[in-house]
């Protein structure tokens, strides 16, 4: 068995490819079920964010397992495998383990050290367990990866001042507005006519950062207006006007800066829609949804500038140099966690031998105890029998302690296999085919 990962990210694929493979929360269960239907995939889990889709699997054969996952991705996205493959990466065993831990720590993020990815890995673990698609191996890997992410953030300054996708989007708006006014740097958003479409987690973060950059009034649109109203209640210091999506066109005409972050699977703002709206001023769209909420063709309009998540690199590169230095320290911590996981997994090789040894010794204990008790006669009380029973169990546990500890201790594969063979031979644990 081997652990593999197949996926794509902002490093390997542009947003127009990533959005075709984005798996929304409501489709995760069915996708996990489809992946588990492949006979060579024993355990599987899916990580789907705006910047990456990664599928982790415990497979019988690494090459067959990777091919199966690629086949699933092609079927799901309706993109031919030959077209898709150049954008995919795959890692096996040690590299796959290290990759997940680096992802969890924020070391592979567009925004180095961003914190949201850790909660996304936690959700990945929860969904795998709820759908019973993960087992002891992936559950342990995911749990240890979460621990690695927490450790990096606790023991280094990697996350200090780290921007998120949402804060990078707000900074991009500041930069572009500044450039329009001949200013090289970040400008206040006070006075900007801001529209936020969507009322989920990303929109909450957007409003938080908009507030910190001077925005004191905005319009919030959502399909479910009650959700928008509930979100606005968390920001009493900002004037937030809540509306339904049916007022999108009118709201756009009253805005100078529009952020979109919804779970829509298709763009709902395109050039045709914009042409039917009477725009009176220049307008900036910043779309952080994946799949994208805004069609690329809106850029053809003379009054519109449109940006998506791939355009955030301009902001991210401004403050990456400092965290790149800290990332080296963080990566050493992650590699330590990888070693701990791999040693644990290697120790599982000893479990069948340990279980057989325990089983054989328990059988001997029971047989010899029964012989002894039968010689004691009826005068031997039930309480005394319990004492003797506990005594014999304690002796067996004492005998097993040293060999079991040795078999489970960190050692090379060759050393462990040699130890296992010695134990099997000394205690006659081998079956007839092995002898």
UniProtKB/Swiss-Prot annotation:
Pfam families named in the record: GlutR_dimer, GlutR_N, Shikimate_DH
Which parts form a coiled-coil structure per UniProt? none
Active-site residues are 50
Q: Which residues of this UniProt protein bind NADP(+)?
A: 198-203
Superkingdom classification of source: Bacteria
GO biological process terms on file: chlorophyll biosynthetic process; protoporphyrinogen IX biosynthetic process
Q: What positions are marked as the site Important for activity?
A: 99
Nucleotide-binding as a keyword of this entry, yes or no, is no
Q: Which residues bind substrate?
A: 49-52, 109, 114-116, 120
Q: Which pathway is it part of? A: Porphyrin-containing compound metabolism; protoporphyrin-IX biosynthesis; 5-aminolevulinate from L-glutamyl-tRNA(Glu): step 1/2; Porphyrin-containing compound metabolism; chlorophyll biosynthesis
Sorted alphabetically, which Gene3D superfamilies does this protein's record hold?
Glutamyl-tRNA reductase, N-terminal domain, NAD(P)-binding Rossmann-like Domain
Q: Which N-terminal stretch is annotated as signal sequence?
A: none
Query: What UniProt keywords are attached to this protein's entry?
Result: Chlorophyll biosynthesis, NADP, Oxidoreductase, Porphyrin biosynthesis
Its EC number is: 1.2.1.70
Q: What else is known?
A: During catalysis, the active site Cys acts as a nucleophile attacking the alpha-carbonyl group of tRNA-bound glutamate with the formation of a thioester intermediate between enzyme and glutamate, and the concomitant release of tRNA(Glu). The thioester intermediate is finally reduced by direct hydride transfer from NADPH, to form the product GSA.
Q: How does it assemble?
A: Homodimer.
Free-text comment on this protein's domains from its UniProt entry: Possesses an unusual extended V-shaped dimeric structure with each monomer consisting of three distinct domains arranged along a curved 'spinal' alpha-helix. The N-terminal catalytic domain specifically recognizes the glutamate moiety of the substrate. The second domain is the NADPH-binding domain, and the third C-terminal domain is responsible for dimerization.
Q: Sorted alphabetically, which PANTHER family does this protein's record hold?
A: GLUTAMYL-TRNA REDUCTASE 1, CHLOROPLASTIC
Write out the similarity annotation: Belongs to the glutamyl-tRNA reductase family.
Q: Mind telling me what this protein is named? A: Glutamyl-tRNA reductase
Gene of origin? hemA
